[in-house]
């Protein structure tokens, strides 16, 4: 018999859930595994004119042209890896391809992201203290406590507001 799982207000089911963990700046962030289509080595990125600075450009991933977004730039975080000489992707070697019904885009990351199984008891969804005029304030789904670390679980599609979404759609 299948166990019935209740959804919390953040959309996370009770019990265990899977996340993809990656670093941006000095902090660890995570996305729910359902938001990730694949992880690829960052391809050549073609810069597009008149796009926000956090949109690094577009790339061809498996025949699809998608916008590539730099969360360090978007969040105003201190860069952990400087621009690599002879490249256009800031030394960020991997791209998380995320997809929703409305949008498909890539998120630049420095290292191979890790998959982590999280118990509901290690997830605190009451954290909604960020108020940033550049992004939707509801993008933080909660904080995960894992082995003396705090990991910020974000909803990538809430990070992108309507104006940003239109800009990204025009890019790709």
Go through the PLM ranges and name each one.
Residues 1-172:
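An acidic, low-aromatic, low-complexity terminal/linker signal
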